Amino acid sequence: GNMFGVKEFHKTANKAGIKPILGCEIYVAKESRFRKDKEKDKKSDHLVVLAKNETGYQNLIKLVTYGWTEGFYRKPRVDIELLREHSEGLIVSTACLAGPVPRAIMSGNNAKAEEIISTYKSIFGEDFYLEMQRHKTGDPEKDERTLKYQEEVNQEIKKLSEKFGVKYIATNDVHFVKKEDAFAHDILIA
């Protein structure tokens, strides 16, 4: 991900009397950020990373920068090593269906989901959250399938939350504010 709009967002929010929450959806390489394997690194997992203080903001900037300068392959990517090194002051959640835990659940690999939760909990402690989503995509052709996957993932998230003592939060997979920006977003991620 990127943080190109942070300065303008921060200024506008403060002007309106709103405390801005600064963060970024980042991509996590399957293994090392340095590996660029055509097949294994085709898709990276998503994580939502929020800064809870100045230290977290500085660490978030470092993660995003390293993603672009060291981990870029199709997209800017970080790895577990960088997350461990720059975890202080950050709040992390498992993101949308393209996050590591939802992907493991959807592939029927609950052992992998548990391993991922253990890893992130060891890095971020109480600042690691599991995400639950239930919303339409805006594309009627995708809605039925997406809602089905979200429901399956949500049921498992509840169980994993209890088993690992990790809280879950309700979120939406939002990437633009105005409906008319959907086309531009689709082009951007194509």
Predicted regions and their residues:
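Phosphodiester-processing cores and adjacent nucleic acid-binding clamps
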Residues: G1-A190
